[in-house]
C-alpha cells in the first residue's frame, strides 16, 4: 500500500491564516459584539483547516484575510459537529 502524502493546507496561497481563540479571547469577542456564541457563523469540524488546527466543537476560530482596501480583516467561526 502506498504511503499517505502529507500536505500542510496553510502553505497554500489561497488559504488564509487561522487560529483558535483562547477562552478569554472568546469571552472578549462576545462582549465586544454583544452576541451569544450561538450567533456566530459556523464551520464544520470536518473542514480541512479545522482538522489541521486540531480544533474541536465549541472552539472559536479567528480567520485573518487580506483585503485590498483594509489591509487585513478578521472574521470568526464557531466549530460545530458535522
From Swiss-Prot:
The keyword 4Fe-4S does not apply. One of its GO terms (cellular component) is DNA-directed RNA polymerase complex. HAMAP family: RNApol_Rpo5_RPB5. Keywords: Cytoplasm, DNA-directed RNA polymerase, Nucleotidyltransferase, Transcription, Transferase. One of its GO terms (molecular function) is DNA binding. Its EC number is 2.7.7.6. It is found in: Cytoplasm. Part of the RNA polymerase complex. InterPro entries: Arch_Rpo5/euc_Rpb5, RNA_pol_subH/Rpb5_C, RNA_pol_subH/Rpb5_CS, RPB5-like_sf. GO terms for biological process: DNA-templated transcription. SUPFAM superfamilies: RPB5-like RNA polymerase subunit. It catalyses: RNA(n) + a ribonucleoside 5'-triphosphate = RNA(n+1) + diphosphate. Its main location: cytoplasm. It comes from the Archaea. The keyword Secreted does not apply. PANTHER family: DNA-DIRECTED RNA POLYMERASES I, II, AND III SUBUNIT RPABC1. This is DNA-directed RNA polymerase subunit Rpo5. DNA-dependent RNA polymerase (RNAP) catalyzes the transcription of DNA into RNA using the four ribonucleoside triphosphates as substrates. Belongs to the archaeal Rpo5/eukaryotic RPB5 RNA polymerase subunit family.
Amino acid at each position: 500500500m502506498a504511503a499517505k502524502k502529507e500536505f500542510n493546507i496553510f502553505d497554500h496561497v489561497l488559504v488564509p491564516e487561522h487560529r483558535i481563540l483562547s477562552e478569554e479571547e472568546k469571552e472578549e469577542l462576545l462582549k465586544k459584539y454583544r452576541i451569544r456564541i450561538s450567533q456566530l457563523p459556523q464551520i464544520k469540524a470536518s473542514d480541512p483547516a479545522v482538522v489541521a488546527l486540531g480544533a474541536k466543537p465549541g472552539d472559536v476560530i479567528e480567520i485573518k484575510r487580506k483585503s485590498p482596501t483594509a489591509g487585513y480583516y478578521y472574521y470568526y467561526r464557531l466549530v460545530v459537529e458535522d
